[in-house]
Amino acid sequence: MIQFDNVTKKYPLGNYALNDVSFSIEKQDFVFFVGPSGAGKTTILKLLLKQIKPTSGSIFVNNKDITSKKFHDTLKLRRSFGVIFQDFKILFDRNTFENIALALEIENMQKKKIKEEVEEALITVGLSDKKLVFPVQLSAGELQRVAIARAIVGGRDIILGDEPTGNLDPKTSWDIMKIFKKLENDKTILIATHNVDVVNSFKKRVITLQNGKIIKDQQKG
């Protein structure tokens, strides 16, 4: 489903964000990318979203080479990903329901279908009782649940999380990760994190990066 073949990302000053990285991820895999700041975790997610281009190597998503000059479906590609960043944007003049619905309104989905999708996502993330509440009244953990709900609506089958528990306390981090666990039977999940405690709580595949290289690829459990 996702494949990196000898991917390198080198910046003009000569430093490597990724250096000859190769791995493959199958449908409905749950994979953690771990390592210190600057190891290359976020670079992998940005390459998948085509926010940046690799210096060399190939990246395949659903058997399509997204690094090829012949690839022109960037918008469609991005819509296949549900993305959760640590500093995700939220509109403070819209309530919880409206913030989640925004992702579908952009795609001109029918209002009835939007309501169904958002209601289901609210149940999944445990925010049904907060759907009319505005962001200023939500905790940090609840705001992150809004971000997850926004990522899973619309049938997106690949979830990318960049430090999704980075600013949360241990208990809230655990609660957030339990939501991802509920999604694993339907989604392919890739999470970049330096939170080793969270990673060790899950018996999942862990790809460890250091200085732009994979130093360990381990299936736990």
Residue ranges and their predicted role:
Residues 133-136, 154-155, 185:
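Conserved signature/switch motifs of ABC ATPase nucleotide-binding domains
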Residues 66-82, 183-184:
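ABC ATPase NBD coupling module
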Residues 159-162:
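Catalytic Walker B motif of ABC-type/P-loop ATPase nucleotide-binding domains
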Residues 1-4, 9-20, 70:
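A short, flexible loop at the N-terminus of ABC-type nucleotide-binding domains that lies
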Residues 134-144:
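Conserved ABC ATPase signature
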Residues 57-65:
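Conserved ABC transporter NBD signature motif
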